[in-house]
Design a protein with these regions (language model features):
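Metal-dependent phosphoester/phosphodiester hydrolase catalytic core
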Residues: 1-184
Length: 184
């Protein structure tokens, strides 16, 4: 993404392009989005020249073409409403089906910004999403629990390697220094 040059029309066209591929499978199976870096709905874009920015347009067009669940009698999730026509961002949610709990997280929308682009401890689920996740897991009686996230945190691949770092596991980049209490 080029946040300073992308337009609402660009994002509309991008989502329309996905439809040809998703249409081949979504007529017979459900489709749930776990938001990631390519949707552009990152917190550090939200406040850049609103309402004309990548995050707001990305959220608007994603919701228009591919709405995610929002809280009701079946789904739980984010109950916030955001300005600029976004409304409920439909960015994290959960549901139980049979004896399985499905939880979808957003590791991009909430950061503790200390730089132009979040690094390490800047990436966060945010306290509201974290509290919701904790309550959802603790209160579930489902035998099976599945948690989905695009990346384990807002940046970086390598799940098992990164799982113990920063907000998720509490360790610094060296993998030896525990500092969750200091940073959270």
């Amino acid at each position: 993404h080029y946040p300073s040059t992308i337009t609402s029309n660009d994002l509309d066209l991008l989502h329309k392009d996905y439809r040809q591929y998703l249409g081949n499978i979504c007529h017979s199976i459900p489709f749930f989005i776990s938001l990631g870096n390519h949707e552009g709905e990152n917190d550090y874009y939200l406040n850049q020249n609103p309402p004309n920015n990548l995050a707001i347009w990305g959220t608007y067009w994603r919701k228009y073409y591919y709405p995610n669940p929002s809280p009701n009698s079946f789904y739980s999730g984010n109950t916030d409403y955001e300005p600029y026509g976004i409304g409920n961002p439909e960015n994290y949610y959960a549901w139980t089906w049979g004896d399985a709990l499905f939880v979808v997280l957003d590791v991009y929308r909430y950061q503790n910004i200390n730089s132009d682009k979040p690094q390490n401890w800047d990436w966060s689920l945010g306290i509201k999403q974290y509290t919701w996740l904790r309550n959802t897991l603790e209160n579930s009686t489902a035998k099976y629990k599945f948690v989905f996230a695009h990346h384990i945190r807002g940046q970086g691949r390598g799940a098992i390697t990164n799982a113990k770092l920063f907000e998720w596991g509490g360790f610094e980049a060296d993998g030896k220094t525990y500092s969750f209490d200091k940073n959270r």
